[in-house]
Amino acid sequence: SSTEFTGGDGGFPYIDQISTKYLISNYVYNDAVYLYSLVGTTYSNGYSSMYLSSSSDGDSSDDTEGDFINPGALDSNLDILYANGSKSGNFKIRRFIDLDTNSPSDNYITGLPNSPSAFHISTHTSTSTTLLVGTDHGEVLLIRDANSSNSASQIGNFIGSVSNLKFGSNEQEIYVTLYNYGVVNIKYTSDGGTNWDDKDGNLPDIPVLAIQPNPYSSDEVIIGTDLGVWKTTN
């Protein structure tokens, strides 16, 4: 059996991976970011669910903040959701904090060069957030201590728009994909972004939307494209 928590155009959902205390759904933009307790927590509104962000709470800016289907990433270790919070040329990340308490709140990471289009949280740290951010203008940003820091370092700048990024076996190894035609669609670094290699190989000129390195085999990478799922073993 299943339970419908919400409906509409849909968006990215997030589930607490550590203690499975909550899940988060989104509608469009940051217009209806909804937190649901899975363990019976009563939030400050007196219910077991609450809006983290919604234009219905009187803040009309939420209904156009970010993208229509808005990207984000959940740090389950620290109970923080990072989401695109850009609006009207002001490029920033919205940081929803204290998600495991009955009074979550939010703030912003500001000063980004362009609008975030992809996020990835390192699995190699657990007491702080190491956050990778890709933008719609091809920049790759690294934010260490993103749970408290407001400073992003640019470690890559490519032609196209970033669709996905991942750390590999450590935080020096990074994979990046771009979803445009006529560009290099897969980039790779083994030194934290000092040097980048092109990894399209024999892939056709097609948008690449996702990438997943195999944690058990350093040579194997799975790639999601507009023309199906591909893999490489070298």
Which residues does each predicted region cover?
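Extracellular glycan-interacting surfaces
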Residues: 1-234
